[in-house]
């Protein structure tokens, strides 16, 4: 009998031999918690435990070995039963020049610790701190200081021990953590000549602690907000916007995104890594900065999907495409986590770029570099990643004077096998900043990248930025929106188009020319962020005359229904007050990421390029409502409805006598209709996370707020209404000569 026949017989008699590959036991439940598997019960699969908030799993994870047995956690000698344990926060080891209460060995979630200073010392930081469910204290380190040193007393974070008690220029202090706590931040700090301590404040953390998205997003967002606000090339900065990931207007940013694709990362988690990176790319490209993006995935070996040396690394579409094409199975034969090799790929890119540009050239020396490392675990092959970081710092000549030219953000995800010490070693350490984080899961990572931009930090008049985070107010979402009124009654809306000019409708002013009685409310009128401005000058289009065609039987005509208001003072930019982008300007061109040499016609073709264009306006209550602007043949059918309006136009024979090409048209059944009082407000679109005003609300055939004093009450027109609702908005592309005449010194207009 031949060998193949023997094999066939064995498989026939013992079918279990065909699928006898080992798998790990399934008796791995955790008391009070749940678990997930990265690759089922097969060897190489990572089992990750989760517990309700305020508890942590012990052990955090287990690995299915090739033998079909679960790997014993490092901290235990035997395979112990997984349990959920209560989270505790570290206690103070010492508190200088004061007392704290209560004095416990550690503190439960929700527990407080209070601090008081001795006479002659002033308390800096938080007098009361509470233990949070993630094992971290809220607030700031409490310090009792008498101001006697060249640098302020650096304090002692909870759970830490400090050596060094002199705070003069050149003096150093050193920190270590007690018991099993892990130190993040700088273990040594030096008092510098400017009175500031070097490095980052050290924090002692429980090994199982993690960061909340709401803590990480501001830390990252502040960095990018400063960078974005500092790189608007159409504005001149009068003050420093801070350090952070900042590049000068003449400089360039290289952004390196490193995505862990090792075996411990599930396919779904890798997808969220990609989505988070795409969010970052989308948002950073939506601002007018000079940026090149590198994309590197890594497991046992790195794979460069996009290099900063490629011209298409400056093109958002190409970068996003590279991310979308990243395949989870690209690294299926490599199970390790070689963070060193990933960072070394960045170093090699830098080295090649330096050779191309020349080490001594300004073109090379003015490039700033930001590395964002997304990983779920500890480096376990290839050598220490710190070595690669040292090489990167060396090639960039990072010293005290050039510290701003490199930022490394190390973000661990999943708590499972993330090594706090390694992340802290890799992350940059700069005064007042954090660069190392651990998030509970990939969903938290996605939240961070979704909400990381804090637009209140953008102090330039960068246009078209709305805060789209879940907790933003209506005014923060549309910060250009303003209310125009006499001393009491609100009458119209408008839009900030610069820090001193408002665009609105001319018919708002037809009842009188004494603009000294009028006011413009900018920001949220219901909060401290609202401010009332006087009008220095009103510019009404001379072509506007609502009764211009009365002799033709057209009782109201709204051609040239456009006006500009110059405010008596400039508006301070904030998350509640910011101009919208006006098409056909250099500011809008940068926001659209269009090439130099683009024209006004190019903007119109990009923004109004469909038969039905989704757009928005702002309601009386501040909410954003949806409409569809009809273009081409659909514009004609939209406008034709006016012929059915016999009250305003009893003898109309030609619709174009009323609806000229100055107007955009909306109002089909799925659209909202503007109310009386919403006239003059912006009609706007969103492109690449920026907002562009293409029209302003002028007039319509239906008032959904008629008979109601409630700003939140709107009534849709019945389907049987004749004529059906139609709304008309001044098309800003048709008002270019007038806008250029009056705003030529305010905005930078493109050729028509």
From Swiss-Prot:
A motif (MIDAS-like motif) lies at residues 260-264. Residues 22-86, 87-146, 149-206 form the Sushi domain. Disulfide bonds join 24-64, 51-84, 89-131, 117-144, 151-191, 177-204, 463-581, 492-508, 584-600, 638-665, 675-705. Residues 1-20 form the signal peptide. Residues 254-452 form the VWFA domain. It is found in: Secreted; Cell surface. Glycans are attached at residues 29, 112, 290, 333, 467, 471, 621. Cleaved and activated by different proteases depending on the complement pathway to generate complement C2a and serine protease complement C2b chains. Cleaved and activated by C1S following activation by the classical complement system. Cleaved and activated by MASP2 following activation by the lectin complement system. Cleaved and activated by GZMK following activation by the GZMK complement system. Its cofactor is Mg(2+); Mn(2+). The active site is at residues 507, 561, 679. The record marks 243-244 as: Cleavage. InterPro entries: Compl_C2_B (IPR011360), Peptidase_S1_PA (IPR009003), Peptidase_S1_PA_chymotrypsin (IPR043504), Peptidase_S1A (IPR001314), Sushi/SCR/CCP_sf (IPR035976), Sushi_SCR_CCP_dom (IPR000436), Trypsin_dom (IPR001254), TRYPSIN_HIS (IPR018114). Its EC number is 3.4.21.43. The MIDAS-like motif in the VWFA domain binds divalent metal cations. Belongs to the peptidase S1 family. This is Complement C2. The gene is C2.
């Amino acid at each position: 009998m031949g060998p193949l026949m023997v094999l066939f017989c064995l498989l026939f008699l013992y079918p279990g031999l065909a699928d006898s590959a080992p798998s790990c036991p399934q008796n791995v439940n955790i008391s009070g918690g749940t678990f997930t598997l990265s690759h089922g019960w097969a060897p190489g699969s990572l089992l990750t435990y989760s517990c309700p908030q305020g508890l942590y799993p012990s052990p955090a994870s287990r690995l299915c070995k090739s033998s079909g047995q679960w790997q014993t956690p490092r901290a235990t000698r035997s395979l112990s039963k997984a349990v959920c344990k209560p989270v505790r926060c570290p206690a103070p080891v010492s508190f200088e020049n004061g007392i704290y209460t209560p004095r416990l060995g550690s503190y439960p979630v929700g527990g407080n610790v209070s601090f008081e200073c001795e006479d002659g010392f002033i308390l800096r930081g938080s007098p009361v701190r509470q233990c949070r469910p993630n094992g971290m204290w809220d607030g700031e380190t409490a310090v009792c200081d008498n101001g006697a040193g060249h640098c302020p007393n650096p304090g002692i974070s909870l759970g830490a021990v400090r050596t060094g008690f002199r705070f003069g220029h050149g003096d150093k202090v050193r920190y270590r953590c007690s018991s099993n706590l892990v130190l993040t931040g700088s273990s040594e700090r030096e008092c510098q000549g400017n009175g500031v301590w070097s490095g980052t404040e050290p924090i002692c953390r429980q090994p199982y602690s993690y960061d909340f998205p709401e803590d990480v997003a501001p830390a990252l967002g502040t960095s990018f907000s400063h960078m974005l606000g500092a790189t608007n090339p159409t504005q001149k900065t009068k003050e420093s916007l801070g350090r952070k990931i900042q590049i000068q207007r003449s400089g360039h940013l290289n952004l390196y995104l490193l995505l862990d694709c090792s075996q411990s990362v599930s396919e779904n988690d890798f997808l969220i890594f990609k989505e988070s990176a795409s969010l970052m790319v989308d948002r950073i490209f939506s601002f007018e900065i000079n940026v090149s993006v590198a994309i590197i995935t890594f497991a046992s070996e790195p794979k460069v999907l996009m290099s900063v040396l490629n011209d298409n690394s400056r093109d958002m579409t190409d970068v996003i495409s590279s991310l979308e094409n990243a395949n989870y199975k690209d690294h299926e034969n490599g199970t390790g986590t070689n963070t060193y090799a990933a960072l070394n790929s960045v170093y090699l890119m830098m080295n090649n770029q330096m050779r191309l540009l020349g080490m001594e050239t300004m073109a090379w020396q003015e490039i700033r570099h930001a590395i964002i490392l997304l990983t779920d675990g500890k480096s376990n092959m290839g050598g220490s990643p710190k070595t690669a970081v040292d090489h990167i710092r060396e090639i960039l000549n990072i010293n005290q004077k050039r510290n701003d030219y490199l930022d490394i953000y190390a973000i661990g995800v999943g708590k499972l096998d993330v090594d706090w010490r390694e992340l802290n070693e890799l992350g940059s350490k700069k005064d007042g900043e954090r660069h190392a984080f651990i998030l509970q899961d990939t969903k938290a990572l996605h939240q961070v990248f979704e909400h990381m931009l804090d637009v209140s930090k953008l102090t330039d008049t960068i246009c078209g930025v709305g805060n789209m985070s879940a907790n933003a107010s209506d005014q923060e979402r549309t910060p250009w929106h303003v209310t125009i009124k006499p001393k009491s009654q609100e009458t119209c809306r408008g839009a900030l188009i610069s820090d001193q000019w408002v665009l609105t409708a001319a018919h708002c002013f037809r009842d009188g020319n004494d603009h000294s009685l009028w006011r413009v409310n900018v920001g949220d009128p219901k909060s401290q962020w609202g401010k009332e401005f006087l009008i220095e000058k009103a510019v009404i289009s001379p072509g506007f005359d609502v009764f211009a065609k009365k002799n033709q039987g057209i009782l109201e005509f709204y051609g040239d229904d456009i006006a500009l208001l110059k405010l008596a003072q400039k508006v301070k930019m904030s998350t509640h007050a910011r101009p919208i982008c006006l098409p056909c300007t250099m500011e809008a061109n940068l926001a659209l990421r269009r090439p130099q040499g683009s024209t006004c016609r190019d903007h119109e073709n990009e923004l109004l390029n469909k038969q039905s264009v989704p757009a928005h306006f702002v309601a009386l209550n501040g909410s954003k409502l949806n409409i569809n602007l009809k273009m081409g043949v659909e514009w004609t059918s939209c406008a034709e409805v006016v012929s059915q309006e016999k009250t305003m136009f009893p003898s109309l024979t030609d619709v174009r006598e009323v609806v000229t090409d100055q107007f955009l048209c909306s109002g089909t059944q799925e659209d909202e209709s503007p109310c009386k009082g919403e006239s003059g407000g912006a009609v706007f679109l969103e492109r690449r996370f920026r907002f562009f005003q293409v029209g302003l609300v002028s007039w319509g055939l239906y008032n959904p707020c008629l008979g109601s004093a409630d700003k939140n009450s709107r009534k849709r027109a019945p389907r049987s209404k004749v004529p059906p609702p139609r709304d008309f908005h001044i098309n800003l592309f048709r008002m270019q000569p007038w806008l250029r005449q009056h705003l030529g010194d305010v905005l930078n207009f493109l050729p028509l």
